[in-house]
Amino acid sequence: LMVHEVLGVKIALGDHRSSFPTTQNVLDLLTQIRVGGMIAGKIGVLHIHLGNVTGAFEMFEEIVNRGFPIRHIRPTHCARDKYVFSKALEFAKRGGRIDITTGGSCCFESPADAVEAAWDAGIEPSIMTMSSDGHGSVPRFNEKGEMVGLGVGGVACNLRDLKKLIARGHAVEKVLPLLTRNVARGLGMKGKGEVSAGNSADLCLFD
């Protein structure tokens, strides 16, 4: 975390490709991230790839119940399946930030539907983000669960679902922060995420 560009650590939980760390392993890692962030002047986040094996959110609950700040725990792929999504909503209602992946597996017809379902469930829009998982590896499996190939995730999914949500009548000022301000604030990136005097001029223009 002393390296300027480093904001935290990424691991996988609840996935057949993960190392299946124990709750204490994860808590040890979170403590190092938190202390490193305090020294470096950053939030320090544990970015967590969620699979469809149960147990990850139960682990988060135990860690938070023991007094560890929830803001350091950042699960992604939160709409991978219905179970993960339901647990993600519980996590968000405790103040945890959740991320909906726009590329890859989704238990709804589209990630935009997952975002709407979270809003309908009363989740505060400011603690939600969307991400594409772009350029990530995308394994392909056959009906037997055997991997038969490996692809690369696309990067256009965020824009696709942004357009869907706006086309459905949601205000731009509610939808756009999923990809801008919410991300910047969640990662503690000062001067990023919104158009304001003194901020970086990171602008995209759309017709």
Language-model features: locations:
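Metal-cofactor-binding active-site regions of metalloenzymes
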Residues: L1, E5-S19
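Sequence-level motif detector for i,i+2 pairs with an aromatic at +2
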Residues: H4-V6, I70, P125, A201
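Active-site core of metal-dependent hydrolases
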Residues: R17-F20, N25-F141, E146-V152
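His/Asp/Glu-enriched, well-ordered alpha-helical/loop segment
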Residues: D120-N199, L203-F206
